[in-house]
Amino acid sequence: SYDYKPELSKQQGKSLPAAVKPDIFFGKVGLLRGSDWEFRQRGESGLWVSEMFPEIARRADMLTVIRSMVSDSANHTPALFVSNSGFQANGFPSLGSWLSFGLGSETESLPAYVVLPDARGGPNGGASNWSSGFLPGEHQAVILRGGDQPVRDLFPATPISKLAERESLSLLQLLNKKHLASSGQDQQLLARIRSYELAGRMQLSVPEVSDYSAEPESIREAYGLQDPVTEDMGRRCLLGRRLLERGVRFVQLFSGGPIAGSPRASWDAHESVKDNHTLEANRIDRPVAALLDDLQRRGMLEDTLVLFTTEFGRTPFAQSDADKVGPGRDHNRYGFSCWMAGGGVRPGSAFGETDEVGWKAVKDPVSWNDFHATIMHLFGVDHRKLTFYHNGIQRRLTNVAGNVVKGILA
Protein backbone atom coordinates (compact mmCIF):
# COMPACT_ATOMS: atom_id res chain seq x y z
CA SER A 1 0.00 0.00 0.00
CA TYR A 2 2.94 2.33 0.69
CA ASP A 3 5.74 0.61 -1.27
CA TYR A 4 5.29 1.01 -5.03
CA LYS A 5 6.82 -1.85 -7.04
CA PRO A 6 6.21 -1.45 -10.80
CA GLU A 7 8.58 -4.36 -11.44
CA LEU A 8 6.21 -6.68 -9.57
CA SER A 9 3.43 -5.93 -12.06
CA LYS A 10 5.83 -6.45 -14.97
CA GLN A 11 6.82 -9.87 -13.60
CA GLN A 12 3.24 -10.98 -12.89
CA GLY A 13 2.94 -14.72 -13.55
CA LYS A 14 6.67 -15.40 -13.27
CA SER A 15 8.46 -17.36 -10.55
CA LEU A 16 10.24 -15.63 -7.70
CA PRO A 17 13.98 -15.60 -8.57
CA ALA A 18 15.29 -17.31 -5.45
CA ALA A 19 17.93 -20.00 -5.02
CA VAL A 20 16.35 -21.21 -1.78
CA LYS A 21 12.65 -21.89 -1.30
CA PRO A 22 11.15 -19.01 0.71
CA ASP A 23 10.52 -19.65 4.40
CA ILE A 24 6.85 -18.71 4.80
CA PHE A 25 3.99 -19.75 7.04
CA PHE A 26 1.97 -22.13 4.83
CA GLY A 27 4.81 -22.96 2.44
CA LYS A 28 2.87 -22.58 -0.82
CA VAL A 29 4.89 -20.45 -3.25
CA GLY A 30 2.86 -19.48 -6.28
CA LEU A 31 3.79 -17.13 -9.08
CA LEU A 32 4.43 -13.42 -8.63
CA ARG A 33 1.27 -11.36 -8.32
CA GLY A 34 1.01 -7.63 -8.99
CA SER A 35 -0.91 -5.23 -6.78
CA ASP A 36 -4.69 -5.04 -7.06
CA TRP A 37 -4.54 -1.27 -6.48
CA GLU A 38 -3.20 1.58 -8.56
CA PHE A 39 -0.34 3.60 -7.08
CA ARG A 40 0.04 7.34 -7.53
CA GLN A 41 2.37 10.00 -6.20
CA ARG A 42 0.58 12.12 -3.64
CA GLY A 43 0.73 15.69 -2.40
CA GLU A 44 3.72 17.98 -2.58
CA SER A 45 6.01 15.25 -1.28
CA GLY A 46 5.25 12.91 -4.18
CA LEU A 47 4.99 9.95 -1.78
CA TRP A 48 3.74 6.80 -3.52
CA VAL A 49 0.51 5.50 -1.92
CA SER A 50 -2.01 3.09 -3.42
CA GLU A 51 -5.76 3.53 -3.90
CA MET A 52 -6.44 1.02 -1.13
CA PHE A 53 -6.42 3.95 1.31
CA PRO A 54 -7.74 6.91 -0.74
CA GLU A 55 -8.37 9.20 2.25
CA ILE A 56 -5.07 8.47 3.99
CA ALA A 57 -3.37 8.92 0.59
CA ARG A 58 -4.66 12.50 0.49
CA ARG A 59 -2.75 13.09 3.76
CA ALA A 60 0.50 11.69 2.36
CA ASP A 61 2.35 14.90 3.22
CA MET A 62 1.73 14.10 6.90
CA LEU A 63 3.16 10.57 6.72
CA THR A 64 6.61 9.19 7.47
CA VAL A 65 6.71 5.75 5.85
CA ILE A 66 9.19 3.04 6.84
CA ARG A 67 9.35 0.63 3.89
CA SER A 68 11.96 -1.75 5.31
CA MET A 69 10.37 -3.21 8.44
CA VAL A 70 11.39 -6.78 9.35
CA SER A 71 10.01 -9.11 12.00
CA ASP A 72 11.33 -12.13 13.90
CA SER A 73 8.25 -14.25 13.17
CA ALA A 74 5.74 -14.97 10.40
CA ASN A 75 3.23 -16.45 12.86
CA HIS A 76 0.49 -14.07 14.01
CA THR A 77 0.72 -14.51 17.78
CA PRO A 78 4.51 -14.28 18.30
CA ALA A 79 4.68 -11.59 15.60
CA LEU A 80 2.08 -9.54 17.46
CA PHE A 81 3.94 -10.06 20.71
CA VAL A 82 7.27 -8.89 19.27
CA SER A 83 5.63 -5.86 17.64
CA ASN A 84 4.09 -4.88 20.97
CA SER A 85 6.70 -5.94 23.52
CA GLY A 86 9.91 -6.67 21.62
CA PHE A 87 9.77 -10.39 22.46
CA GLN A 88 8.09 -13.34 20.75
CA ALA A 89 7.06 -14.91 24.06
CA ASN A 90 4.27 -13.56 26.22
CA GLY A 91 4.83 -12.19 29.71
CA PHE A 92 6.90 -9.18 28.67
CA PRO A 93 5.71 -5.57 29.15
CA SER A 94 4.20 -3.86 26.13
CA LEU A 95 5.35 -0.56 24.67
CA GLY A 96 2.45 1.30 26.29
CA SER A 97 3.29 -0.18 29.69
CA TRP A 98 6.95 0.85 29.37
CA LEU A 99 5.89 4.40 28.50
CA SER A 100 3.53 4.47 31.47
CA PHE A 101 6.31 3.16 33.72
CA GLY A 102 8.93 5.56 32.40
CA LEU A 103 6.90 8.74 32.02
CA GLY A 104 4.03 8.30 34.46
CA SER A 105 0.51 9.55 33.93
CA GLU A 106 -0.69 13.05 33.08
CA THR A 107 -4.11 12.42 34.61
CA GLU A 108 -5.43 10.91 37.84
CA SER A 109 -8.94 10.29 36.53
CA LEU A 110 -8.04 8.06 33.56
CA PRO A 111 -5.45 5.31 32.95
CA ALA A 112 -2.11 6.20 31.41
CA TYR A 113 -2.54 3.39 28.86
CA VAL A 114 -5.83 2.53 27.13
CA VAL A 115 -6.64 -0.16 24.54
CA LEU A 116 -9.60 0.15 22.17
CA PRO A 117 -10.19 -3.28 20.55
CA ASP A 118 -12.12 -4.02 17.38
CA ALA A 119 -15.83 -4.62 18.05
CA ARG A 120 -15.48 -8.01 16.34
CA GLY A 121 -12.98 -9.28 18.91
CA GLY A 122 -9.41 -8.96 20.05
CA PRO A 123 -6.17 -9.88 18.27
CA ASN A 124 -4.34 -13.19 18.52
CA GLY A 125 -2.70 -13.49 21.92
CA GLY A 126 -5.37 -11.37 23.61
CA ALA A 127 -4.33 -9.33 26.64
CA SER A 128 -0.69 -10.39 26.36
CA ASN A 129 -0.43 -7.75 23.62
CA TRP A 130 -1.00 -4.97 26.17
CA SER A 131 0.34 -6.65 29.30
CA SER A 132 2.45 -4.91 31.92
CA GLY A 133 4.40 -8.16 32.28
CA PHE A 134 6.79 -7.95 35.22
CA LEU A 135 6.33 -4.18 35.61
CA PRO A 136 4.05 -3.00 38.44
CA GLY A 137 0.44 -3.85 37.65
CA GLU A 138 -0.80 -0.26 37.46
CA HIS A 139 0.99 0.01 34.08
CA GLN A 140 -1.28 -2.63 32.50
CA ALA A 141 -3.60 -1.22 29.82
CA VAL A 142 -7.27 -0.67 30.56
CA ILE A 143 -9.71 -1.75 27.85
CA LEU A 144 -12.47 0.64 26.80
CA ARG A 145 -15.21 -0.78 24.57
CA GLY A 146 -17.99 0.72 22.49
CA GLY A 147 -21.60 0.89 23.58
CA ASP A 148 -23.23 1.95 26.83
CA GLN A 149 -20.59 0.29 29.05
CA PRO A 150 -17.07 1.19 27.87
CA VAL A 151 -15.67 -0.43 31.03
CA ARG A 152 -17.32 -3.59 32.27
CA ASP A 153 -18.54 -3.65 35.88
CA LEU A 154 -17.52 -0.04 36.47
CA PHE A 155 -20.81 0.59 38.28
CA PRO A 156 -22.66 -1.63 40.82
CA ALA A 157 -25.20 -4.00 39.27
CA THR A 158 -27.73 -2.76 41.82
CA PRO A 159 -27.64 1.03 42.39
CA ILE A 160 -26.83 2.21 45.91
CA SER A 161 -27.16 5.61 47.56
CA LYS A 162 -24.32 8.13 47.47
CA LEU A 163 -24.02 7.98 51.26
CA ALA A 164 -23.75 4.18 51.29
CA GLU A 165 -21.18 4.28 48.51
CA ARG A 166 -19.11 6.94 50.28
CA GLU A 167 -19.13 5.02 53.57
CA SER A 168 -18.23 1.75 51.81
CA LEU A 169 -15.30 3.37 50.04
CA SER A 170 -14.05 4.96 53.27
CA LEU A 171 -14.12 1.59 55.02
CA LEU A 172 -12.42 -0.06 52.06
CA GLN A 173 -9.67 2.57 52.07
CA LEU A 174 -9.06 1.99 55.78
CA LEU A 175 -8.89 -1.80 55.35
CA ASN A 176 -6.56 -1.44 52.36
CA LYS A 177 -4.16 0.74 54.34
CA LYS A 178 -4.03 -1.77 57.19
CA HIS A 179 -3.58 -4.72 54.84
CA LEU A 180 -0.84 -2.93 52.90
CA ALA A 181 1.02 -2.02 56.08
CA SER A 182 0.89 -5.62 57.32
CA SER A 183 2.13 -6.95 53.96
CA GLY A 184 5.30 -4.89 54.01
CA GLN A 185 4.22 -2.71 51.06
CA ASP A 186 3.73 -5.64 48.68
CA GLN A 187 3.93 -4.20 45.14
CA GLN A 188 1.24 -6.43 43.63
CA LEU A 189 -1.15 -5.52 46.42
CA LEU A 190 -0.28 -1.83 46.03
CA ALA A 191 -0.96 -2.03 42.29
CA ARG A 192 -4.34 -3.67 42.91
CA ILE A 193 -5.30 -1.00 45.43
CA ARG A 194 -4.30 1.75 43.00
CA SER A 195 -6.28 0.06 40.22
CA TYR A 196 -9.44 0.02 42.31
CA GLU A 197 -8.93 3.63 43.35
CA LEU A 198 -8.58 4.55 39.67
CA ALA A 199 -11.77 2.62 38.91
CA GLY A 200 -13.58 4.78 41.45
CA ARG A 201 -12.39 7.96 39.73
CA MET A 202 -13.28 6.51 36.33
CA GLN A 203 -16.94 6.36 37.36
CA LEU A 204 -16.95 10.09 36.66
CA SER A 205 -14.37 10.38 33.86
CA VAL A 206 -15.40 7.50 31.57
CA PRO A 207 -19.04 8.56 31.01
CA GLU A 208 -17.81 12.07 30.19
CA VAL A 209 -15.01 11.10 27.79
CA SER A 210 -17.19 8.57 25.93
CA ASP A 211 -20.10 11.00 25.45
CA TYR A 212 -19.88 12.41 21.92
CA SER A 213 -22.98 14.59 22.17
CA ALA A 214 -20.90 17.76 22.55
CA GLU A 215 -18.92 17.00 19.38
CA PRO A 216 -20.07 19.05 16.35
CA GLU A 217 -21.99 17.22 13.65
CA SER A 218 -19.15 17.99 11.24
CA ILE A 219 -16.70 16.05 13.43
CA ARG A 220 -18.99 13.04 13.76
CA GLU A 221 -19.53 13.10 10.01
CA ALA A 222 -15.78 13.32 9.33
CA TYR A 223 -15.08 10.25 11.47
CA GLY A 224 -17.89 8.32 9.75
CA LEU A 225 -20.06 7.69 12.80
CA GLN A 226 -23.24 7.55 10.69
CA ASP A 227 -21.85 4.92 8.30
CA PRO A 228 -22.13 1.30 9.54
CA VAL A 229 -18.90 0.43 7.70
CA THR A 230 -16.78 3.06 9.45
CA GLU A 231 -18.75 3.55 12.68
CA ASP A 232 -16.72 1.21 14.90
CA MET A 233 -13.29 2.56 13.94
CA GLY A 234 -14.69 6.08 13.73
CA ARG A 235 -15.94 5.95 17.32
CA ARG A 236 -12.65 4.54 18.52
CA CYS A 237 -10.55 7.12 16.66
CA LEU A 238 -12.69 9.92 18.08
CA LEU A 239 -12.53 8.41 21.56
CA GLY A 240 -8.76 8.13 21.18
CA ARG A 241 -8.49 11.84 20.45
CA ARG A 242 -10.70 12.66 23.45
CA LEU A 243 -8.58 10.44 25.70
CA LEU A 244 -5.37 12.11 24.55
CA GLU A 245 -6.89 15.54 25.22
CA ARG A 246 -7.57 14.46 28.80
CA GLY A 247 -4.05 13.28 29.52
CA VAL A 248 -3.97 9.60 28.57
CA ARG A 249 -0.38 8.78 27.67
CA PHE A 250 -0.81 5.95 25.13
CA VAL A 251 -3.93 4.88 23.23
CA GLN A 252 -3.80 1.69 21.16
CA LEU A 253 -6.46 0.78 18.59
CA PHE A 254 -6.68 -2.64 16.95
CA SER A 255 -8.12 -3.21 13.47
CA GLY A 256 -9.40 -6.73 12.85
CA GLY A 257 -10.71 -9.41 15.17
CA PRO A 258 -9.85 -13.13 15.39
CA ILE A 259 -8.13 -14.51 12.28
CA ALA A 260 -10.41 -17.56 11.93
CA GLY A 261 -13.77 -17.68 10.17
CA SER A 262 -15.12 -17.23 6.67
CA PRO A 263 -15.20 -14.53 5.59
CA ARG A 264 -12.38 -13.48 7.88
CA ALA A 265 -12.94 -10.61 10.31
CA SER A 266 -9.30 -9.60 10.03
CA TRP A 267 -6.58 -8.66 7.53
CA ASP A 268 -5.38 -12.26 7.11
CA ALA A 269 -5.85 -12.43 3.33
CA HIS A 270 -4.90 -16.01 2.53
CA GLU A 271 -7.95 -16.55 0.31
CA SER A 272 -8.25 -13.22 -1.54
CA VAL A 273 -6.19 -10.11 -0.96
CA LYS A 274 -8.44 -7.88 -3.05
CA ASP A 275 -11.70 -8.91 -1.38
CA ASN A 276 -10.31 -8.99 2.15
CA HIS A 277 -8.22 -5.82 2.08
CA THR A 278 -10.94 -3.82 0.33
CA LEU A 279 -13.38 -4.60 3.14
CA GLU A 280 -10.89 -3.96 5.94
CA ALA A 281 -9.42 -0.79 4.40
CA ASN A 282 -12.89 0.67 3.91
CA ARG A 283 -13.52 0.26 7.63
CA ILE A 284 -10.51 2.31 8.73
CA ASP A 285 -9.42 4.65 5.91
CA ARG A 286 -11.85 7.50 6.57
CA PRO A 287 -11.62 7.43 10.40
CA VAL A 288 -7.80 7.39 10.43
CA ALA A 289 -7.66 10.28 7.96
CA ALA A 290 -10.17 12.19 10.09
CA LEU A 291 -8.03 11.60 13.18
CA LEU A 292 -4.96 13.04 11.45
CA ASP A 293 -6.94 16.10 10.34
CA ASP A 294 -8.49 16.56 13.78
CA LEU A 295 -5.17 16.35 15.61
CA GLN A 296 -3.60 18.82 13.19
CA ARG A 297 -6.53 21.24 13.41
CA ARG A 298 -6.36 21.26 17.21
CA GLY A 299 -2.60 21.76 17.29
CA MET A 300 -2.13 18.32 18.86
CA LEU A 301 -0.20 16.62 16.06
CA GLU A 302 3.02 18.42 17.00
CA ASP A 303 3.27 16.52 20.29
CA THR A 304 1.26 13.40 19.42
CA LEU A 305 2.91 10.47 17.65
CA VAL A 306 0.54 8.46 15.45
CA LEU A 307 1.70 4.91 14.63
CA PHE A 308 0.10 2.83 11.85
CA THR A 309 1.57 -0.66 12.11
CA THR A 310 1.12 -4.33 11.24
CA GLU A 311 2.80 -7.42 12.65
CA PHE A 312 4.08 -8.37 9.16
CA GLY A 313 3.29 -7.90 5.48
CA ARG A 314 2.11 -10.18 2.66
CA THR A 315 4.22 -12.00 0.08
CA PRO A 316 4.71 -10.65 -3.47
CA PHE A 317 3.88 -14.11 -4.79
CA ALA A 318 0.53 -15.86 -4.57
CA GLN A 319 -0.32 -18.45 -1.94
CA SER A 320 -1.08 -21.14 -4.51
CA ASP A 321 0.42 -23.99 -6.48
CA ALA A 322 3.81 -23.22 -8.00
CA ASP A 323 2.39 -22.78 -11.51
CA LYS A 324 -0.54 -20.53 -10.59
CA VAL A 325 -1.34 -16.93 -9.66
CA GLY A 326 -3.88 -17.40 -6.90
CA PRO A 327 -5.91 -14.57 -5.30
CA GLY A 328 -4.38 -14.84 -1.80
CA ARG A 329 -1.00 -14.07 -0.26
CA ASP A 330 0.92 -15.58 2.67
CA HIS A 331 2.69 -13.83 5.57
CA ASN A 332 5.89 -11.89 4.85
CA ARG A 333 8.19 -11.01 7.74
CA TYR A 334 11.16 -10.04 5.57
CA GLY A 335 10.04 -6.65 4.29
CA PHE A 336 6.92 -4.56 4.91
CA SER A 337 5.77 -1.01 5.61
CA CYS A 338 4.55 0.95 8.62
CA TRP A 339 4.08 4.69 8.97
CA MET A 340 4.23 7.39 11.61
CA ALA A 341 2.85 10.91 11.72
CA GLY A 342 3.24 13.84 14.06
CA GLY A 343 5.61 14.44 16.92
CA GLY A 344 9.20 14.64 15.80
CA VAL A 345 9.22 12.69 12.54
CA ARG A 346 9.88 13.94 9.00
CA PRO A 347 6.53 14.34 7.18
CA GLY A 348 6.04 13.39 3.55
CA SER A 349 9.04 11.08 3.47
CA ALA A 350 9.93 7.42 3.02
CA PHE A 351 12.80 5.48 4.61
CA GLY A 352 14.36 2.16 3.63
CA GLU A 353 13.80 -0.07 0.64
CA THR A 354 12.70 -3.59 -0.23
CA ASP A 355 13.90 -5.42 -3.35
CA GLU A 356 12.33 -4.83 -6.78
CA VAL A 357 9.31 -7.04 -6.05
CA GLY A 358 8.84 -6.14 -2.36
CA TRP A 359 9.95 -9.48 -0.94
CA LYS A 360 12.82 -8.54 1.40
CA ALA A 361 14.25 -5.36 2.93
CA VAL A 362 17.53 -4.57 1.15
CA LYS A 363 18.34 -1.07 2.39
CA ASP A 364 18.20 0.18 5.99
CA PRO A 365 16.18 -2.70 7.49
CA VAL A 366 14.28 -1.67 10.63
CA SER A 367 13.60 -4.28 13.31
CA TRP A 368 10.95 -3.93 15.99
CA ASN A 369 13.76 -3.20 18.46
CA ASP A 370 14.80 -0.29 16.24
CA PHE A 371 11.19 0.85 15.89
CA HIS A 372 10.67 0.81 19.66
CA ALA A 373 14.00 2.54 20.32
CA THR A 374 12.93 5.31 17.95
CA ILE A 375 9.57 5.75 19.65
CA MET A 376 11.28 5.97 23.03
CA HIS A 377 13.67 8.57 21.64
CA LEU A 378 10.75 10.64 20.33
CA PHE A 379 9.27 10.55 23.83
CA GLY A 380 12.56 11.81 25.25
CA VAL A 381 13.59 8.46 26.73
CA ASP A 382 16.86 6.59 26.17
CA HIS A 383 15.73 3.01 25.54
CA ARG A 384 19.02 1.68 26.92
CA LYS A 385 18.50 3.35 30.30
CA LEU A 386 14.83 2.62 30.97
CA THR A 387 15.17 -0.75 32.71
CA PHE A 388 13.48 -2.91 35.34
CA TYR A 389 15.24 -5.57 37.40
CA HIS A 390 13.49 -8.92 36.98
CA ASN A 391 14.65 -12.47 37.58
CA GLY A 392 18.30 -11.47 37.86
CA ILE A 393 18.37 -9.28 34.74
CA GLN A 394 17.97 -5.58 34.08
CA ARG A 395 15.23 -5.90 31.48
CA ARG A 396 14.33 -3.29 28.88
CA LEU A 397 11.85 -2.95 26.00
CA THR A 398 14.53 -3.38 23.33
CA ASN A 399 16.27 -6.37 24.99
CA VAL A 400 19.98 -6.02 24.10
CA ALA A 401 19.41 -4.48 20.66
CA GLY A 402 17.75 -1.51 19.03
CA ASN A 403 19.06 1.60 17.30
CA VAL A 404 17.23 4.88 16.84
CA VAL A 405 16.22 5.29 13.18
CA LYS A 406 17.69 8.75 12.73
CA GLY A 407 16.72 8.93 9.07
CA ILE A 408 13.05 9.50 9.91
CA LEU A 409 13.58 12.21 12.53
CA ALA A 410 12.57 15.78 11.75
Regions found by a protein language model. Give the residues of each.
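Ligand-binding pockets and gating/stacking loops
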Residues: 1-410
